[in-house]
């Protein structure tokens, strides 16, 4: 169900001696013992709590939840991230030892969700703060989807070369705590201009002769009726 293939791992000799590389051995040990730091702020985290039970049993993947970022190599963000929480999230990520990975779980974490449409304090995606390895959409995602995201992360770890990952993270640092806003005009004023549908001519634009002629014709029509 969750087998990870190594292209250089299945080389055997006549004496059944396994030969591999140090990079593949390191990848195998890391993907088999992921220690996640659970960063849940909303209802998506309740779905992740279902994995702890006997039905899904995420211990079989080697997942051991940790409460300290210095002992974790995977941070799983679930829920809305506000501007006030952003420095704390970045600090937790910086305190994690290398190599470290991020799973963004839920629509609120990936794009800000429904809270980002008319809110000045919501981060429009956690990838603006820390680099994300696996995106898990859903509102909320099911436990089966979380297992699939963990499986995809394990496959990604099995194929990576550790020095290349370190260099890419140093060159492509995409997180920052400096958020600049520009105050705009509110659109919820209650005054809605529908002139683009129909705009009758103003009385100030009509010549006086035409206006009085039209008014007298209307008055005579009302008298006849």
UniProtKB/Swiss-Prot annotation:
Superkingdom per UniProt: Eukaryota
What are the names of the required cofactors?
[4Fe-4S] cluster
Where would you find this protein in the cell? Plastid, Chloroplast thylakoid membrane
Q: What is its main location?
A: plastid
Q: Catalyses which reaction?
A: a plastoquinone + NADH + (n+1) H(+)(in) = a plastoquinol + NAD(+) + n H(+)(out); a plastoquinone + NADPH + (n+1) H(+)(in) = a plastoquinol + NADP(+) + n H(+)(out)
GO aspect biological process, one term: photosynthesis, light reaction
Looking at the Swiss-Prot or TrEMBL record, what is one Pfam family this protein matches?
A: Oxidored_q6
Tell me what topology the record assigns in the membrane: Peripheral membrane protein
Q: Which GO terms describe its cellular component?
A: chloroplast thylakoid membrane
Q: How is the cofactor bound?
A: Binds 1 [4Fe-4S] cluster.
State whether keyword Transmembrane helix applies: no
Q: What class of enzyme is it?
A: translocase
Q: Which InterPro entries match?
A: NADH_UbQ_OxRdtase-like_20kDa, NADH_UQ_OxRdtase_20Kd_su
The EC code for this enzyme is: 7.1.1.-
Q: Name one GO molecular function term.
A: quinone binding
Q: Please state which protein family the record places this protein in.
A: Belongs to the complex I 20 kDa subunit family.
Q: Subunit structure, briefly? A: NDH is composed of at least 16 different subunits, 5 of which are encoded in the nucleus.
**Free-text function comment from the UniProt entry:** NDH shuttles electrons from NAD(P)H:plastoquinone, via FMN and iron-sulfur (Fe-S) centers, to quinones in the photosynthetic chain and possibly in a chloroplast respiratory chain. The immediate electron acceptor for the enzyme in this species is believed to be plastoquinone. Couples the redox reaction to proton translocation, and thus conserves the redox energy in a proton gradient.
| Full protein name | NAD(P)H-quinone oxidoreductase subunit K, chloroplastic
Q: Which organism is it from?
A: Helianthus annuus
Lineage runs: Eukaryota, Viridiplantae, Streptophyta, Embryophyta, Tracheophyta
- Name of encoding gene: ndhK
